Curated annotation (Swiss-Prot):
Belongs to the UPF0161 family. Coiled coil: none annotated. It is found in: Cell inner membrane. Keywords: Cell inner membrane, Cell membrane, Membrane. NCBIfam families: membrane protein insertion efficiency factor YidD (TIGR00278). This is Putative membrane protein insertion efficiency factor. It is a peripheral membrane protein.
Length: 69
C-alpha cells in the first residue's frame, strides 16, 4: 500500500506540481513531507500526518521548518 501512495505523490511532484506556482509555507514542502511520513510511518499513519500538514498549510497559518515526527 505504501508503494501506491508514494507513486501517487511522486506523480503529483513530477506531472502536476511543475504547472502550479510555489505556495507551500513549510520546509520540506508538503509533498516531500508526505513522502517522508509514508516512508517512516507507513501508508496509514504517514498519510494521516500528511493530510494534517496539508490542512495547516494555508496563508493564515504558520510557516518554517516542520520535519516529520
Amino acid at each position: 500500500m505504501s508503494r501506491i501512495v508514494l507513486a501517487l505523490i511522486r506523480f503529483y511532484q513530477l506531472a502536476i506540481s511543475p504547472w502550479l506556482p510555489p505556495r507551500c509555507r513549510y520546509q520540506p514542502t508538503c509533498s516531500q513531507y508526505a513522502i517522508e511520513a509514508v516512508q517512516k510511518h507507513g501508508a496509514l499513519k504517514g498519510g494521516w500526518l500528511a493530510l494534517r500538514r496539508i490542512g495547516r498549510c494555508h496563508p493564515w497559518g504558520s510557516s518554517g521548518y516542520d520535519p516529520v515526527p
